[in-house]
UniProtKB/Swiss-Prot annotation:
Disruption phenotype: Morpholino knockdown of loxl2a and loxl2b in the embryo results in increased expression of Sox2 in the central nervous system, particularly in the eye, hindbrain and spinal cord. It also leads to impaired neural differentiation with morphological defects in the brain where the anterior brain is rounder than normal and the eyes present a flatter curvature. Embryo development is also compromised. Residues 1-20 form the signal peptide. Residues 540-742 are annotated as: Lysyl-oxidase like. The gene is loxl2b. The modification 2',4',5'-topaquinone is found at Y680. Its cofactor is Cu cation; lysine tyrosylquinone residue. It comes from the Eukaryota. It comes from Danio rerio. This is Lysyl oxidase homolog 2B. GO terms for cellular component: basement membrane; chromatin; collagen-containing extracellular matrix; endoplasmic reticulum; extracellular space; membrane; nucleus. Disulfide bonds join C79-C143, C92-C153, C123-C133, C213-C281, C226-C291, C260-C270, C341-C406, C354-C416, C385-C395, C456-C522, C469-C535, C503-C513, C565-C616, C571-C686, C648-C664, C654-C676, C723-C737. It is an enzyme of class 1 (oxidoreductase).
């Protein structure tokens, strides 16, 4: 069997690898694609009007949109009057989906054009076509396009669904409706490559795979196909070899040709061309595409595939996404990173971003800060792209009002198509109470055979767990377990096959992390000491407010006898032990305001029964190491430090409309709610750095929150604030405070120390 990639349609759905693809990963799995019942197109009574349906509109997924109907040579819409889920069910099934999830009134997906073909629709849910439902009559309506109805269908397609164009002679703009599409490698040199970049383009229609005739096939069509499979561009290939191959075998052709403009994010957004006579391609051969992979997915002669994915684009980056190829869009302007407002944000603009970063077309254009809110300026608003720009910065936008009327609640994001690398097949979670948790088991080669085994739990941290959850497509890590009580996935899967794992947290696969080679080291062995994880679709994102730090800094000379609590908590310099009770310590004091801009609440790692009571502060502390305060020399050497070793986490204030959930008083629950912030005032214990022994001069002040990565976040790079400061022996000036990574690399280079919160030893 030859290798293939499969995608469920209409529009792009989900990746699934065939048995043959597993072989190309270097191993095979005893898996057979289930046989599907042959789909039988419904037979409609002769008096039923013949219509075609499609989903349209902006800011939508592949399986949702405004309902549009083609009748008598014209596309039109459906009015929302009397519309119900039963009508949505009929529409979704007519489009080849299993069922309807919901429907939306009042032109949620934008206003359509042309006639309103259906009004006051009454369906029972069992009809085979929308035309069989009761209505005012086709074309009889008193509605406006502000009442256009939309539907959301299930991702799952009807097996064997066959598109039947009953209006072939009258329609030239019908969207393509097929079960699946794939790139099937033909040449031996491409059959073992991952990802598959070259081969026949085939569609699955009526349960059978068919080639497409290259008659009238264009580079724009190839551009769309490559984008769907996660590739930013296409290239020419050796046509002579494929013509020789086609002559040796008799292809089975699809009934239609395809017309794409090159702007489409998916093949299903292209339109049908002419119909082939007798399903033959007399003057041509099967369509072949050859795609160019992005840098993160391209093999190199010396190192093979890149071990970790890093955004290296100078003008655009993604932040806050759970997997490679998704995130909040940030652009660099005037040396400072900022976000894009979601006004007019659509798939065209999102696709430009995705291709610019080395991915394919966009699966989704996200709005409303769905992947967390950014900080700093909003650089672009009302972005309009043609779809062929090299960078989103080349698109037109409203230059007069970059951020006018926009807040970070409107930050735009993207989800891009990425190549299927097969990483999910080399890892699994076993024994969990749900698919999001379990013992980590990896597939490795031992003595010429492929075996499942465990990962040593010693030294297992949140960073390794983050890679596991990303590799499995399960979001973010919520817990990393060094000791587990999960059942094994198989009787013989108890042996430790990987140890010494150390990840930076950005890798696409656990095998890309540093780990012991052939000689393992796991003193406690596997079993209950095997590594485990629990994953979550969302995560918090803590961000410090640099302006608060800059505006609240001052010096205080405080006598030692007033610092007993601080001394017990080790918040003073080591020389304080020799300081007489009446002698002062010089303290650099400041306030810090920690915002949760993520998608879920920030909660302490340890359970409340393990919180520590502090008599000095009269409340429980839930995290022993939550923040590091450091004073650095201009070359990055630490000259003083302040550890507010114990913290009580609570909601000090919240954005409008958000209620506080956490407070320290009365043994209350602790944490920071999404949209709230925890303020540590300058006048509380340990909210300082002891600079008694520091000489006058120029320094860098640095704050890092969640420094040990004890709690998973969607973005660790924004957990640091840096400031320039000048100390003359009596006064201190704090200036240029900013979040790490918020400026260009050239600017960050002038601030030694941590560029972001990625520590060097990992």
């Amino acid at each position: 069997m030859l290798a293939l990639w499969s995608i469920s349609f209409v529009l792009l759905c989900s990746w699934r690898l065939s048995y043959a693809q597993y072989e190309h990963l270097g191993f095979a799995i005893a898996y057979q694609e289930p046989e599907q019942d042959l789909y039988t197109p419904p037979e409609l009574p002769a008096d039923t009007p013949r219509i075609q349906l499609r989903l349209a509109g902006e800011k939508r997924k592949h399986n949702e949109g405004r309902v549009e109907v083609f009748y008598e040579g014209e596309w039109g819409t459906v009015c929302d009057d009397d519309f119900t889920i039963h009508a949505a069910q009929v529409i979704c099934r007519e489009l080849g989906y299993f069922e309807a999830i919901s429907w939306s009134p009042s032109s949620k997906y934008g206003k359509g054009e042309g006639r309103i073909w259906f009004d006051n629709v009454h369906c029972k849910g069992k009809e085979k076509s929308l035309a069989q439902c009761e209505s005012n009559g086709i074309g009889v309506s008193d509605c406006k396009h502000s009442e256009d109805v939309g539907v959301v269908c299930s991702d799952k397609r009807i097996p064997g669904f066959k598109f039947v164009n009953t209006l072939t002679n009258n329609i030239n703009s019908l969207n393509i409706q097929v079960e699946d599409v794939r790139i099937r490698p033909i040449l031996a040199s491409y059959r073992k490559r991952i990802p598959v970049t070259e081969g026949y383009v085939e569609v699955k229609d009526g349960g059978k795979w068919k080639q497409i005739c290259d008659d009238e096939w264009t580079q724009m069509n190839s551009r769309v196909i490559c984008g769907m499979f996660g590739f930013p561009g296409q290239k020419r290939y050796n046509t002579r070899v494929y013509k020789m191959f086609a002559r040796r075998r008799k292809p089975s052709y699809w009934d239609y040709t395809i017309n794409c403009t090159g702007k489409e994010a998916h093949l299903s957004s292209c339109t049908l061309g002419h119909t082939l006579s007798n399903s033959t391609c007399e003057e041509g051969t099967p369509v072949v595409v050859s795609c160019i992979p992005g840098r993160a997915f391209a093999p190199t002669p010396m190192t093979g595939y890149k071990k970790a994915f890093r955004q290296e684009q100078p003008l655009v980056r993604l932040r806050g996404g759970a997997v490679v190829g998704e995130g909040r869009v940030e652009v660099l302007k005037n040396g400072e990173w900022g976000t894009i407002c979601d006004d007019n944000w659509n798939l065209l603009a999102a696709t430009v971003v995705c291709r610019e970063l080395g991915f394919g077309s966009a699966k989704e254009a996200l709005s409303g800060g769905q992947l967390g809110q950014g900080m700093g300026p909003v650089h672009m608003n009302e972005v309009q792209c043609s779809g062929f720009e090299k960078s989103v910065t080349e698109c037109s936008f409203n230059m007069e009002k970059d951020s006018e009327g926009c807040s970070h609640e409107e930050d735009a994001g993207v989800k891009c198509n990425v190549p299927a690398m097969g990483f999910q097949q080399r890892l699994r979670l076993s024994g969990g109470r749900n698919p999001f948790e379990g013992r980590v088991e990896v597939l490795v080669e031992r003595n010429g055979s492929l075996v499942w085994g465990t990962v040593c739990g010693e030294g297992w941290t949140t960073m390794e767990a983050m890679v596991v959850c990303r590799q499995l497509g399960l979001g973010f890590a919520s817990n990393a377990f060094q000791e587990t009580w999960y059942w094994p996935g198989a009787v013989n899967a108890d042996a430790v096959v990987m140890s010494g794992v150390r990840c930076a947290g950005t890798e696409m696969s656990l095998s890309h992390c540093l780990h012991h080679g052939e000689y393992l080291s796991c003193p406690k062995g596997g079993g209950r000491f095997a590594a485990g994880v629990s994953c979550s679709e969302t995560a918090p994102d803590l961000v410090l407010n640099p302006q608060v730090v800059e505006q609240t800094t001052y010096l205080e000379d405080r006598p030692m006898f007033m610092l007993q609590c601080a001394y017990e908590e080790n918040c003073l310099a080591s020389t304080s032990s020799a300081t007489p009770a009446n002698s002062p310590r010089r303290l650099l004091r400041f306030s810090s305001q920690i915002h949760n801009n993520g998608q879920s609440d920030f909660r302490p790692k340890i359970s409340r029964e393990n919180w520590v009571w502090h008599d000095c502060h009269r409340h429980y502390h839930s995290m022993e190491v939550f923040t590091h305060y450091d004073l650095l020399s201009t070359n990055g050497t630490k000259v003083a430090e302040g550890h507010k070793a114990s913290f009580c986490l609570e909601d000090s204030e919240c954005d409008e409309g958000i209620e506080k959930r956490y407070e320290c008083a009365n043994f209350g629950e602790q944490g920071i709610t999404v949209g709230c912030w925890d303020t540590y005032r300058h006048d509380i214990d340990c909210q300082w750095v002891d600079i008694t022994d520091v000489k006058p001069g120029d320094y860098i002040f640095q704050i890092v929150i969640n420094p040990n990565y004890e709690v998973a976040e969607s973005d660790y790079t924004n957990n640091i604030v840096k400031c320039r400061c000048r100390y003359d022996g009596h006064r201190i000036w704090m200036y240029n405070c900013h979040i790490g990574g918020s400026f260009s690399a050239e600017t960050e280079d002038t601030f030694p120390g941590l560029i972001n919160n990625q520590v060097t030893h990992r």
